[in-house]
Structures are given as structure tokens and as C-alpha cells.
Amino acid sequence: MRLYQIQPREYSMLIFAFSLSGGISAFLAAFYIDSYDRKTVLLTAFFFFALGSILCSFANTYHLMLFARFFTGLFGGLLGGVSTAYISDMVPYERRGKAMGILNLGFGLASIVGIPFAIFICEHMDVFWPFRMIGILSLLTLIPAILYLPKMRDHIPPDTNSIKDIALAIASLVVYPFTYYLFPDLKIKLQSHISKIAEVLQVLKDRNLQNALMFGFFLVLGHFMFISFINPYLVGNLGFKLEDTKWMYIVGGISVSLTSPTIGKFIDTLGKLKSFRILILLSFIPILVISHIHEASIMMALLICAFMFIFNSGRMIAAQTLITGAPSEEQRGKFLVIRSSLIEMSEGFSALIGGLILTRDEVTGHLQNYNYIAYIAVLIGILCIYLASKIEVNSE
């Protein structure tokens, strides 16, 4: 916020731009996601995400950064849904909690290494270097991913159209009245793609999948509404120095890394729904505590944040496992990408709503009304407990 001299509202728009574009692209991808190899889609999106990150590193004005975030989100929005679908296709439902725990272990390690390293770079170089590093490391990661990740094609229908056919059918929509009657081949292909739209609409009409989608949307809404502003809250209200905030991510990341595999096994053993209820209720405690203290030592604040990371991560593992069991194998790709679209939208709206509720005292630098954000997050969490009970498992 200091770099561009912006208020919380403008800061939230940077988050919203990424999430909005990610939500749009993920929803559009739902129409064709099950027609292609998961690996191809995943790595293509990852490549353009890397390019978008490099573009962010050259954004020396607020509006240029806004555009760069929007571009990056177009491809970042696909990664969550496609990677979850990839794992779900590989791992049966009864062992999926452990798999999601291992996936979350990766996020924990990223917090331990990535975020503190980014803060270190910001201190000693400039704030744009982390974006460059993300882009470069992402491009380097593509090499082993291309070589070693297995293809995932079992979900692809035998009558799948080629990319050329899809492009031709989409182009024909522009001159639909002419192509429909003058070119029978295009008419047939267009009808084929309209049937894909019907398949997506069928997913959206399924009551069980509606419950799963709403559950995922509100869970992320409550989580990100609170977590998006934790960093400026620690600096502005609890007196953290900017360089001290890296310890929150180090401690939180280590905590998540140590506990995620165990939590995943716990979820598989106790049951997905019961585990989720326990973990989300426990997550309310650090959320309410951290948002209501006015003074705290760094050690005390870090301890509270560690528990917040552990329980938030745990409830997300349980939620992901519940959600991936809702669709059938044939519906899974479309469903998870639609879910990814809603999650991106949810993240964006959570930041936008938080930016409207929060204000910053120009004299003290304190963020005001953060406790109201915590209350809303808890109420949304209670709603999620109800929605989780409505989800039925239909796939293995």
C-alpha cells in the first residue's frame, strides 16, 4: 500500500482483479476441461501464469499492476481446479484425505521458504523481484513436470473433438445464422459443442453439487475475508515491523508442514464430515483472539497465528476431500473447474468486502473494524457446517 500510496479499498482491488479473471477463465474452461489430458491443461496454464508473474514485475504504476494481476489470474484461476482434479483422478476417495494433506504440505513449505524469502528480497532489492523470481522458478519447474508427470486421459470421451474443431465451432458462433444453414459440418460440430454446454448446466442443476459448490464458495469467502488483511493488521495494529511478518509465515508454514500429513490421516480415519466440524470450530478460536488483542509480544502473536494456520489448513483439507467426493468421475473435471471459478470469485469478493468494511486511521495507521471481519468469518463458518452436512459422496 505504501508503494502505490493506496488505501485498503485499492489494495483489495489488486486481489479482486486476479480473482475475477481467474473465476471467468475457470468457468469457461469447464466446458472443455474433460476433453483434454489433465497434464496438458495444467502445464499450459502454469506456463502462462509464469509469464503473468514476470509481467507483474514490470508494473511500476498501480493501474499497470492491476492489469498484470488480471492477466495472471486468467491462468492462475485454472491451476487450483485442474490440480485437484488431477489428484482426484489418481487417488481413491478413501485415501484422498492423506493426498490432500500432502498437497497442503507443499503450501506449508512454500510459506516457510517462499514468503520469507520474498520479504527478504523486498528489503534488500525491490518489491518487484519476488514476481520475477516466481516467474523464473515456475518456468524452471515446468521442465521436470513435462518430463515426469504422468498423462491423465482416462476421463476423456472417445468422441472428443480436436482443438481445431473447437476453435472452428466457436468462430462459427459469430456468424451463426449463416454457418448453421450453409455449412452442415459446422452445424453438426456446433451442436456437439452446445451439448457440452448442456453437460455443464447439468452439473449446475444437480442439488448435491450445488450444495458442494456453495459450501466451497462460502468457506473460502470467510477464510480470505479475514486472512487477506492479517499482514497489514499485524503491522498497523500490533506494532510488527514489516520485516517481522516473515516470521508469521515461517512459523505458520512449519506448523502446517508438520501437521498436514497427520491431519490428512486423521480425516481418513475419523471421517471427512466429523473432522471438518471439529477443525472449523477450533479455527474460530485463533481468529477471534487475534482480532481482539490490542497489544501482544511477537512470540504470543506468532503462537496464535500458528494455531490459526494449522486449523485453517486442516479444515481446508477436510473440505477439499468432502468436495471431491461429491461428483461422479465423469463430472469431476467440469465440477472442480466450476468450483475453482467460484473460489476465485469468492477470494476476490472477500477482499472487496473486507476493503469496504476496513478503514485505516491516517494518524496511527491502525486498521479499524477488523473485529467485525472476524465475526463475519465465524458466522460464515457456521453456515459451512450446515452446508457440509448436505453433501453426499458419489465418487471414489
Label the predicted regions:
Residues 68-106:
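Cytoplasmic helix-loop-helix junction between adjacent transmembrane helices
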Residues 102-150, 169, 176-179:
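Helix-loop-helix hairpin linking two adjacent transmembrane segments in secondary transporters
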Residues 19-27, 111-112, 253-261, 348:
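Residue-level signature of mid-helix packing/kink "hotspots" within the transmembrane helices
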Residues 209-249:
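Extracytoplasmic gate region of multi-pass secondary transporters
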Residues 273-318:
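C-terminal transmembrane helical hairpin of 12-TM major facilitator-type secondary transporters
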Residues 5, 37, 58-64, 293-295:
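Helix-breaking motifs and short loop linkers at transmembrane-helix boundaries and internal kinks
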Residues 153-172, 180-213:
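Juxtamembrane intracellular "pre-TM" segments in multi-pass secondary transporters
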Residues 24-60:
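Conserved MFS/SLC helix-loop-helix module at the cytosolic interface between two early adjacent transmembrane helices
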